[in-house]
Every structure is written in C-alpha cells, then in structure tokens.
Amino acid sequence: MILVTLFCICALVTSLQADARLSKRYVIGGCPSHCDKSMCPTMPKDCSTGQVMDHCNCCLVCASGEGEACGGVGKLGDPVCGESLECSVTGGVSYSATVRRRGKQGVCVCKSSDPVCGSDGVSYRDICELKRVSNRAQSLQQPPVLFIQRGACGTSLHDNPNSLRYKYNFIADVVEKIAPAVVHIELYRKMVYSKREMAVASGSGFVVSDDGLIVTNAHVVANKNRVKVELKNGASYDAKIKDVDEKADIALIKIDLPNKLPVLLLGRSADLRPGEFVVAIGSPFSLQNTVTTGIVSTTQRGGKELGLRNSDMDYIQTDAIINYGNSGGPLVNLDGEVIGINTLKVTAGISFAIPSDKIRQFLAESYDRLARGRGTTKKRYIGVRMMTLTPSLSKELKGRLRDFPDITSGAYVIEVISKTPAAAGGLKEHDVIISINGQRISTATDVSAIIKKESSLRVVVRRGNEDIILTIIPMEIDP
C-alpha cells in the first residue's frame, strides 16, 4: 500500500513539472535557483511602456503602465511596473514579498503625484505621464522628453515649500538678508608722473546707520588719497573718514546720499560658541558680494599668538575663507547679526575677525567724541605727493633729469600742491627729503610718521648737488 502511494505522488510531481515546461512558466514556489532564458515568455513587438526585468531578475518583460495589473504569485514573467511606477494592492498596500506569497495582484500607480516639467517645455501631471509621453516619442523615432525640473514649468523654489532646499537653505536666507548693507570700497591715488588717479587697493565694509555711516578696517582706508564706496545697486559715492582706531584696526567712514540705506545690526560676540555656523561676505579681488561660509573655530585667539605685538585683543578664528578684499566686510551669524569684521587670513582654513563687542565699544567711543565736538583727531598736512626713492628709481630719474642728485634713498617729491605749507616753505618737485628735525629719512613713510607727531618741521632736501634747509609748518585738516 505504501509503495502504491509513493508511486502516485511521484507521478503527480512529474506531471506538474511537465505542465510547467509546456507553459514555459514556473508554478507557485518562487523564482528558480538558476535563470533559464528559454523559460521566459515571448516579448511583444510593441512595448510602449518600456522593458524591465521581472521579479526574478531573469526575464525581460514589457513593463505595465499606470493603471495596469502587476505582481502575482512570483513566477517568471509576472507583470512588473515600469519606471517611476510602483505596484499597489487594494487599499494602497505596496506590493511586497509577503503579498506575492499570498498570490495577490496589484495595480501600477505613480510613485509621485507632484507635477514635473519636461525638456519640451510642457508641464506634466506627474513623472509617469512624462515617461509615457517620452516612451511614445521614442517608439516613433522622436527625441525623448527629459525630466528637467520638479514642479510645473515656470515655477520656482518658493512654489514648493516642502522642498528640502526650501526648508534648509538657511545660508542663502542669511546672505539675502545682509547683502544690501555690504559695500565695496575702492582706494585711489594719483599716478607718479600725471594727475590721473588710479585704484590702488580695495576692501569691504558694512552700513551701520541708514544715513551712511560705514564700518571697515583701519588698514583698508589708511594713507589713501580718495575713498570711494560702491553700493550693491552699483551707485558710487565719495566717502569721508570720520574716525579711526589704528590699534584695533577699525575705521568709520561716511557717505552722503538722499535715501536711507539698509543697515546691519551687531550681535554679541561674547555669546559665540565654537562650532557655530558663520557667513563671511565681502569683495575679494573686487568681486562684489562674494560669500564664504564656515564655523567658529575659537572665540578667543590672542593677538600676540598671531604675532601682533601691540595687540591686546582676542580675535575670532574661523575657517570661512577671507581673501584680499574681504577685509572690512562682516562676519555674521545665522540671524544675520554682525559678530565680527573680516580682518586677516593666515592660510587656507585659518582666518580671523575682530569681535563685534570691540566694534560696539569703538562706535560708543566715536559717538562720545563726536558728541563732545572733538571728533577724529585732526590730520597734519603739508601738501606734497612723494614716493620712496630706491636705487632703481634713482637710476631712472637720472636718465630723465639732467641735474638729479647722486642719491639712492630718501623721499622723492613728485608734486607740491599750490597754496599749501609745503609750497609756502619752499619745497619743490624733484627734491629729495633726506632728514626732518634731525631724523634721517629713508622712505616716504618716514616723512608721514614725523608729520603726524611734529608741529614744526626743519626739512633738509637734496636739490641738484646742494642740501637746502627749509622750515615747514603743517596745517591741520579733517581726515
């Protein structure tokens, strides 16, 4: 009896296997251990929805389109949804291995219901409609329609508030907020052998009052003939230097214009923590409103650590890139508050800013000086343009000027401005200043330094082959 039963079971299994081979399909039991392409169903000639691999990753089948059947019992050749579609069983349940084992079929639905824009300039209901049109075009030997933008054609990021870019683009929000109050500063000097002006340096600054007060670095505006400020809208204005703290490297300049300006507010640098995001904005290499970002590396980097012997200030260290021309621009936190002035770069990834608490102190002291009528210390002025005499310049001048003296150092006088102390004292063009008040002069900077300190100058100049003594009394002017 047992032998008869075993024989019947074997016969039944053999019969089922034969039926499976005849139908070129595997029955319930899942995918085969080895892919036999001969068992795959025949691919129809017209497959407008595209071709995909079946669940067993063995047979290439014609993809089911939106609304068409998908899934099944997990056999070779079971219908599979096309690109951008997913198989959904009734009630929105996605097709899975568990559903497959239960032998349920589903319907292909689009993974996304959001509108999209195609390369043909047409807005589509969803990505699936675009793919369907693209496949149809390709079947007609036409170019495919490419998916180029989420959202309908002509829409922007603000039309899709659920976008991750819209939600987390906080750096761009900060820049948009602060950029109108950041200015580009150009410094001009007259050329050596003509009265034409040329730009010799540039920097950045930011507006702190709507009537045109601008904060920048002292070194940006120091020793320049003319300071010009360019706003974000391209308008340019000459600026006056109102106050300077050379030790702290902070300067206050002002432009006069009829309209009110957007301003930046100061944050509290004392509240900064290492690791906070910061944004540096300025005009490196005269490229306006260039933005770099980084974090606060440390909030208290001593000036003496940086080799600044006369500095008792702590600097903010950041890895936000600060380049030439960024100097004077703001370093801001994510609230758009200024927490420092971009000041110097040591190397890539190591830059420093003057803390905003120091700026606040400078502005308070400056206000106090202006309120008392003292303002900035008057600048001593003699009315001369000069440059440092070097051996190469001396050689060049000897070739041009027949009576130029045999001298290779000093301050060479390029121009004496009429009706100034220098003109009244007898200084002339092509003179070489070699000493003032008994101090030897080697550079033009030496002359400027003495003028700042002395109210009367006993100047020795070399003119031709003679040394001539002149007395010049500097006048005081607003800087």
Curated annotation (Swiss-Prot):
Which PROSITE patterns does this entry report, sorted A to Z?
Answer: IGFBP_N_2 (PS51323), KAZAL_2 (PS51465), PDZ (PS50106)
Question: GO MF annotations for this entry?
Answer: growth factor binding; serine-type endopeptidase activity
| This protein's record includes keyword Lipoprotein | no
The EC number(s) given in the record are 3.4.21.-
What CDD domains is this protein classified in? cpPDZ_HtrA-like, KAZAL_FS
Q: Tell me if Nucleus is a UniProt keyword of this record.
A: no
Report the record's Gene Ontology biological process terms.
Answer: positive regulation of apoptotic process; programmed cell death; proteolysis; regulation of fibroblast growth factor receptor signaling pathway
Superkingdom? Eukaryota
Residue ranges annotated for the IGFBP N-terminal domain, each copy included: 27-111
Please list the residue ranges annotated as the PDZ domain.
Answer: 364-466
Q: Indicate the residues that form the catalytic site.
A: H219 (charge relay system), D249 (charge relay system), S327 (charge relay system)
List the cysteine pairs that form cystine: C31-C56, C35-C58, C40-C59, C47-C62, C70-C87, C81-C108
Where does this chain mainly localize?
A: secreted
Q: How does it assemble?
A: Forms homotrimers. In the presence of substrate, may form higher-order multimers in a PDZ-independent manner.
The name this protein goes by in its record: Serine protease HTRA1A
What is the native source organism of this protein? Danio rerio
